[in-house]
Amino acid sequence: MIRKSKKITKKRGSRTCGYGEAKKHRGAGHRGGRGNAGHQKHKWLSVCKFNPDYFGKYGFNRNPCLIKQLETINIGELEEYILKYKDAFQVEEGKVVVNATEIGFEKVLGKGRISTAMVVKAVEFSEGAKEKIEAAGGEFVEL
C-alpha cells in the first residue's frame, strides 16, 4: 500500500505553499496570460522559434463553381433501374438502350454485377463499368 502524502499537505505552514511570492499565485499575471495570450506581443519569440507557421495564410480554396461534380450511378443499380422500369426503355437488336443523362446521371461506375445486354449512353464511364458492360454483351457510348 502506497503511503504518500499529497504535496499540499507537505506544504502546509510554509505560507506560500510552494508558489514563491504570494502574488505569483494570483490570476495568470505571472505567466504572461493564459493559453496563447500574448503570442503576437511579449511571447512572439517563442512563436517564431517553436511554431513559425502559426500566423499567415498559405494555399487556396478553389472556387466551388469551377469544381466539376458529376452525378454517378453504379452499373448494378442501373440494371436494377432497368428491370424496375422495363417499359420506359427501348430494345434494339436484343439490347436495352439506356441514356443515363435522361435519367439524371452523367457518369457510370463499375460496382455491382450485370447480366442484361445493354447499350449505355453517358458522359463518362469508369474502366470497370466499360469492362462489365462489354462482358455482358453490351456496349457503351460516350456523349
Curated annotation (Swiss-Prot):
Gene Ontology BP, a term: translation
Biased composition (Basic residues): 1-14, 23-38
Annotated stretches, region: Disordered: 1-38
Protein origin, superkingdom: Archaea
Keyword Cytoplasm belongs to the record: no
Pfam families linked to this entry: Ribosomal_L27A
Molecular functions (GO terms): rRNA binding; structural constituent of ribosome
GO terms under cellular component: cytosolic large ribosomal subunit
Residue ranges of coiled coil: none
Family: Belongs to the universal ribosomal protein uL15 family.
Subunit structure: Part of the 50S ribosomal subunit.
Function: Binds to the 23S rRNA.
HAMAP family recorded: Ribosomal_uL15
Protein name: Large ribosomal subunit protein uL15
Organism taxonomic ancestry: Archaea, Methanobacteriati, Methanobacteriota, Methanomada group, Methanococci
